[in-house]
């Protein structure tokens, strides 16, 4: 192997988890359609993309993921070069799919040579020694008679050949290399709890890094064990370093070629199990395509409940924060045969929610990457987004947000407790139409909003503690819940909790508020988690009828927002009055305070995909006489709203909102 883990970790740590501000490029504006690539399909691919307003053409002939072309890529390289040239001729861009750590040998049951037959030592393994090799039916993309293997990223000769193939692909002139499934094998049946891989190469790399034998010295699956936590960190760092090396090889031959990772785990526990953490990976690639379906709830758009949509938005807003100016692509699925739902409505809901959240769209058929459920719907929607691209994809800057802290280490070691608290906190703010910003270790020091919420942030480093101390010292308010601060960044229990010391707490079992000196709320019961649990019990049935009055979640939400405002003396810069079934995402876009609205009222999983209209939404901006308020409804045209001026504010009312809209003042 050309580089050892210690070197790889140094390379990763030298790159910040977030990128510096950069000029936008084609990856920020994509409207994606996918295609299977053969030389005889090149003209058709580019023609259909042009006709349906696709910008950013995905093509798939997977050189390293098919054993024959892994060995001899010549013919497939010609097709990649041809489609790149055709795309450029019509002022479009193309990127090509390659597998990360998976390789399929076609008809392996009838051939002398296959990946596994030739290189059994390159394959990932369970701790029992069982290899990660599968046959037809293990996944929908594996045909009968085929052999599917999952490879150790530490297999030196495989990695050498793989990076050579990456350079050859980038040298064709293609605009992007799109890497799918850079995963440890933990997502097929029977492998979910393996915490693979325990192949010789990986075990030796871990031993060099930690002096621990992964087969003997760790308690597999036990997060109380320091050795297992090091194994968790090692697995994440390994895949991040793998993607960084791919990007370095891409750029070494084509500096304008982008590296994109496709990742299905989002903010939840799956990221830890699979080892592909988008928080870390955004720092080493140019974009991430999130196949964020089941993790965010519901699977397809047609199957999502109203609460699933809020989980989806929580994920996307987290991704947008992790990206730090890089684009967020959403490879999610709209409709896969749900008979009770019109596929066009399902597509519209997915496109609306994601564009309002600032993510780039990918239109696909069913649950595959290519095709479309309805080309006319794609054409119309993509054309509308093309006409309003700056409205949705210009940088969104904060105005006066409440911060919600995402702690990668807490998620890694205490996923269940943290994620419920985190998502519940985001949902409470979104459903109260309060501007928020996801804050991370990379952005904590620069965060200047009036309130910072630490939702069950169990693990904090000394550097994070010091940044929080500095934040509170200038009069800003803190909200600390649950066991925030109990553990250090390695997951070790502290003798004394520095957050409790900062807040001057005498006891940790009582709720305390402070309005003099340090302004804070300390709540050991964690309201974010409590709110999320209330939502799971009540929200969908209430959303179906559009009536939140008298619900426990609505009473809880109003009470906690009032308490937050009182302790922090916080007054929103933009005020939105609407039901909790409407999301309001607030930001400054090209200097204009803007509100991106998404309505989920009336939706029912697999039954109803047309919303109940939200009526008489009131929005108040800071402004003066002469200010102009404009609205762009989803798939509609820009028009003016009647403004009212009062006490330094300009106010408008939206009589009716069907799906979504963006409103701004200028």
Role assignments for model-derived ranges:
Residues 39-65, 171-176, 286-288, 350-357, ...:
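Catalytic domains of carbohydrate-active enzymes, especially glycoside hydrolases
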